[in-house]
């Protein structure tokens, strides 16, 4: 009996000691947590104030500017030395791109946001159509980058060579984005599906600033925010990104147009020869009945024409019917044969898919005339 009582006393004392240790550990943990939070806040520095997005660009007369979004065909890959005859004499169009030609003909500042090799989903992201989100809660500061992943609406991680949208345009704020009103920089991490995120450090800023970015915060490229009110020239799909599903491609176009509530836009048809586009596996070099496409519409062109009506320009057909004349070229026998097949003259190309400066000049003129037709400029 005495042994049992002794054992019970030992157990009681042990329990009391255990409870005291638990309470002490909990108190110590709470103190440590409070201290850690204080240290964290001290380390972070001053809390940043959200930035106001810049007003969209207009010129001195209140004229909307023009932004051209696309891949290498907007960027101007293949542009080279070129001269054309005009009523005023020889004109040097060396290294002209379609956006530059459009700017010259309209007198309106035109931005070239083309990125070589960009797929349609990437172009839509850069233009502010398809929205990206942060995948976790993070504190960020303006001194040291924090890792985070960017995901689409389905939670899939998105990995791009660059996200910010300016392409080859001069820009004194590279890699800039708005996240929850904060101006941030995002840079890819080599061989990773995460990116480096930090607050943009304004010139003259002293000390460390920080901000809390909650999970599922929208990520908006600064280029898309700055140019949300521009007249938009949109060309995409040649490099894939839409699974050769015309409905997906149309949705990507619409995501840009609807996000910016844009009523002034031009959808540019693909200029690869029929059956040669890497993005469209549906189209063959001939129609189902074996006839050549010629100046008729491919399935891709029909899908975009049906979806966007007069906003669509069939650039392949424009180049077939006007490209050589725009540059003062004479049609060769080979050009005539290619015309019947729907193939753009090699005199306008630098390779099988890209134009040279003659081709880009003619393309820019086609965009100019389309804008006149739609009443965007005179």
Stretches with model-predicted labels:
Residues 23-64:
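N-terminal, intrinsically disordered, polar/charged segments of Gram-positive cell-envelope systems
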